[in-house]
Amino acid sequence: MLLIEVASCDDRADFALIARAYHFAKKYHEGQTRKSGHPFLHHCVEVARLLAQLRMDHTTVAAGLLHDVIEDTPATYGDVAAAFGDKIADLIDGVTKIDQLPYESREARQAETYRKMLLSMVKDIRVMLIKLVDRLHNMRTLEHMRAESRARTAHETLEVYAPLAHRFGLARIRWELEDSSLKFLEPEIYDELRNKVAMKRRERETYIEEFKAPIEEKLHENGIEAEFTGRAKNFYSIYNKMKARNKPFEEVYDLLAVRIITGSVRECYHILGLVHGIYAPIPERIKDYISTPKSNMYQSLHTSVIGPTGQYVEVQIRTAEMHRLAQFGYVAEMAAFFGLPIRERCEVVACPEDAALEEAAPLRMGPPQLQPAVPERERELGKCWE
């Protein structure tokens, strides 16, 4: 299934390389199990699958399969380099924790591990991406760890990995890391928020339909095509609002976010004017991240308006290209340039907005759409595992 998923993202990928990495990992992780009781290899495959969903190149997917062999098996850097070359060996070494050398404390060892990871990241940004998805899958299985380990890992995730994901524009990864950290650090609050958000789901969907109806009418009158999505904000975001305002869940009103995706920058501004003509805006909440992108190159128009019944609603307006990059990250986009050093990638990102999008255009990587492979393709991919 991993090869079929990679094929759905890049049919030019080196499937033989990925298959060799799979068999190498299988050999060295033989007999190892995780705290969950699952074979260790399952974690390696999941990390590789997540990297494939980020549209990463076959070298990175292979490194995802191998990311723990130096740290957790007898395999050495030399073994990996001999089998797969220095580039993959360097990626794996970059995400390998420093456990072999003596340190006065766990904190000192962890600090040195961070330092090593950051230095490796300067050479190749894919080190950070592998580490992020490794942490993401570890958080999905964290309940099998001891209570002390759960708390320590959740704190580290919230303080280090979620901000990294945010910094590099990986919104989906950031939200899941934040919410899963809250789940283990404040389980009662997490369960309460999850239950209350779930209870209000039908009410929320009805409200969003009522909210967007007059906007859709205006868009139709002006000949603008757009797609609407609506969601509640993630649990950690809601939790922070409750803390900052010292209010219970029921008194935090701006929990709804509506996203409008359209075809051009010009239409984004046109839609903003139409929305403000229908609903009263809150002036201090209007943000133009299109003309002035965030430091991670995120682009969108943000506004908060007073919707029906007086409830605050956040509205985000962006183009389809901006939305794709907001969801999957500019770093994932740039890292898709096979072997391109981080400094060169940063030069691409630092171009003026239009030029940056033109540079990224050939690497279109929308949300994963895993399609059944045709029989011939399945047979071809299947041979790689033999």
Regions found by a protein language model. Give the residues of each.
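Active-site helical microenvironments for divalent-metal-assisted chemistry
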Residues: M1-V313, R318-C384
